[in-house]
Amino acid sequence: EANKAFDYFSIKQRDLSNIWEFEPFHFNDVDVLTEEFSDYFYDYNEGDLLISSRSLNSVFIIDPQTLKVKNLFFGLTRRQHDPDWNKGYITIYDNQTFWGVDQVGNEIRDYNSRIIKINYIDQNKIETMNYDTSFISDARGNNHILETDNTIFSLIISPYEGKLLLFDKNKNIFSLINNQEGDVLPFSNGKILDKKKLVQNINLCKK
């Protein structure tokens, strides 16, 4: 979905207040602009910080030397986590945490979680990355994108489902569900450590 309407007023939402004390900012993740990606973002410099504030539904780009806020993305996500620099775009794990109430007073959830993509050249172009397997989380959650010459791999962690999902473009090619005797054991902070070995192993599995 492109160019979704901004969601400004959900910062008033007091989700998970029965579990945690409410924090007005709750900075929950930071990603450093590395040399690998800095050439794709000419308005930013290597070392600039991409910082997520869960409670404000906001992601900031900050110069760590001057503390200048170079950019702000507000109202695009709800209770997001894990913003990442990529090759000319930014991805954010959008929990889309929101509960409604059905006719008998039970809490219901209208939306799954998602990964959004913000194009650097045209920042008004906001896309939801489409995958053939859904995931849903209230907090945490992370993603890692690996682009090769001919495809894009996405690693997605849905912590409270105990899900680790690996996608080749939009197709799920590997899943790990961390359940034990009906209990979910949460995952957190998955990352592709050896990019070359991942591609080699996937190619071997295809043969």
List where the protein language model places each region.
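Histidine-/acidic-rich catalytic cores in large beta-rich domains
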Residues: 1-207
